From Swiss-Prot:
<keyword id="KW-0004">4Fe-4S</keyword>
<feature type="binding site">
    <location>
        <position position="432"/>
    </location>
    <ligand>
        <name>[4Fe-4S] cluster</name>
    </ligand>
</feature>
<dbReference type="GO" id="GO:0050661">
    <property type="term" value="F:NADP binding"/>
</dbReference>
<keyword id="KW-0411">Iron-sulfur</keyword>
<dbReference type="GO" id="GO:0051539">
    <property type="term" value="F:4 iron, 4 sulfur cluster binding"/>
</dbReference>
<dbReference type="GO" id="GO:0020037">
    <property type="term" value="F:heme binding"/>
</dbReference>
<dbReference type="GO" id="GO:0004783">
    <property type="term" value="F:sulfite reductase (NADPH) activity"/>
</dbReference>
<feature type="binding site">
    <location>
        <position position="471"/>
    </location>
    <ligand>
        <name>[4Fe-4S] cluster</name>
    </ligand>
</feature>
<dbReference type="Pfam" id="PF03460">
    <property type="entry name" value="NIR_SIR_ferr"/>
</dbReference>
<dbReference type="InterPro" id="IPR045854">
    <property type="entry name" value="NO2/SO3_Rdtase_4Fe4S_sf"/>
</dbReference>
<feature type="binding site">
    <location>
        <position position="426"/>
    </location>
    <ligand>
        <name>[4Fe-4S] cluster</name>
    </ligand>
</feature>
<feature type="binding site" description="axial binding residue">
    <location>
        <position position="475"/>
    </location>
    <ligand>
        <name>siroheme</name>
    </ligand>
</feature>
<comment type="pathway">
    <text>Sulfur metabolism; hydrogen sulfide biosynthesis; hydrogen sulfide from sulfite (NADPH route): step 1/1.</text>
</comment>
<comment type="function">
    <text>Component of the sulfite reductase complex that catalyzes the 6-electron reduction of sulfite to sulfide. This is one of several activities required for the biosynthesis of L-cysteine from sulfate.</text>
</comment>
<keyword id="KW-0408">Iron</keyword>
<dbReference type="GO" id="GO:0019344">
    <property type="term" value="P:cysteine biosynthetic process"/>
</dbReference>
<keyword id="KW-0521">NADP</keyword>
Amino acid sequence: MSSSSIEDIKGKSHRLRGSLLESLANPTTGALGESDQTLIKYHGSYQQDDRDLREERRRQKLEPAYQFMIRTRTPGGVITPQQWLQLDAIATRYANHSLRVTTRQAFQFHGVIKRELKTTMQAINAALIDTLAACGDVNRNVQVAANPLLSRAHADLYTDAAHLSEHLLPNTRAYYEIWLDEKKVAGAGEEEEPIYGPHYLPRKFKIGFAAPPINDVDVFANDLGFIAVIVDNTLLGYNVTIGGGMGTTHGDPDTWPRVGNIIGFITRADLITISTAIVTTQRDFGNRTLRKRARFKYTIDDRGLDCIVGEIQQRAGITLQPARPFVFEHNGDRYGWIEGEDGHWHLTLSLPAGRIADTEGSTLLSGFREIAQLGIGEFRMTPNQNVVIAGISPGQRAAIDALVTQYGLDTGNRAPTALGRHAMACVALPTCGLAMAEAERYLPDFNAKLQPILEKYGLAEAPILLRISGCPNGCSRPYLAEIALVGKAPGRYNLMLGGDQRGQRLNTLYRENITETEILAALEPLLGRYQQKRLPSEGFGDFLHRTGIIALPPYPTHRHVISSTLQA
């Protein structure tokens, strides 16, 4: 759909109402009307179909097996045990019997059919969780560092992020009328949208809060990032980054991924003001005529960083202070038990591509249900698609450990390679309409193919960062990985190499449109050289750059955040 069509739909939608009620009530199809397929995204859902069944249903002269993905708005991915049980029940009753943890710390339900869409939405809201603005041209789910060590500062970080998430919600009552049966009042459909305006943003907008030395949120991949400045366990404020983004288009030189620029420091008191100024700057300056160039990163590249920063400061009435020193050491999760400063313990468990389900070889859904039934602590989803069972007292650990062992919840932690423990993949086939190749379903097979090569060169415990994406939109943040596969066609991928383990450098296209056999053949000699010639503690991506095998990608944009400029 063209940019003009989408802008027209938004403008005529009566603040995101459209004809959704009529589409939902239409019994002759499992789909929504065309314009409503756009509008439902703002309510937290995508219309999809089971692509595994497309050809068979076409032969039977049936419409596609339409279904809906629903995504939660859970800032920082924090939920209570009771909420976990409610989401588990929803997944079992209305979806495909699985919970999917996303790279933005939300949950996705897949396989919901239209006639149960409203009931499912109501059940999610009954858990005191909503889906408003989880998709669409608005601010999406706000990421927050899942850092269990700095307990007090992390609590303040989460409070700020949750406050900002609420502040940036659309003002329309459409969500509550359509899904929760709120009565319309005079003026419904004409509510003021003081932040978004009648056409909302040109494209989606993503925000992340990071807590050094860990960059688990990949803060430089966000349109707007906040890097916590913590001194003596007190959160003083944030270094602000703008202009990150992963999406691109295969073969189009006018699109590219980008890492954000650090533009200065703010105190906590200025968080809402500066964020509003940044979002409204993108609202007014972003490209609404060419959708593939509508993200904030292109607004900055087209108009210039100095111009955009000047506009932000003018709107906010704030002069940004010089950025404070900080260092990121890595962007992964730390598995196993970790003690926080307050004496509580936190258990991080690695999930295969974020999928929580009971399958022939796994009882993850049942196991986490049993832990939630204990009613202790809380659950935190990580930006790496994993789960933290957080806030556990020393005396409660044994009960958790027993269930972890019984249900094999730490199987991911015990994966035979470090690469496998840290790898990520987007959902891709069969539900994502944009997928060109497999990702989540392919990840375990590809890990298994890489394992003997890694073991051959003594690299089984080398923390090499692998990410797989089914298309170039990059939901798994592949362009920051040391090794990335980006889908081109069924069974074929672009092989990207040379990111780092800190989320600060874009990788580079190494081989284009190649098969698994060709990917493994390309990687083996590089891994062999890495084993022989790497420096102590040198990452694979850093090695590729130091030895000249890989250079920065030729994008006309910001490609690398230099660590030396960030240190005192």
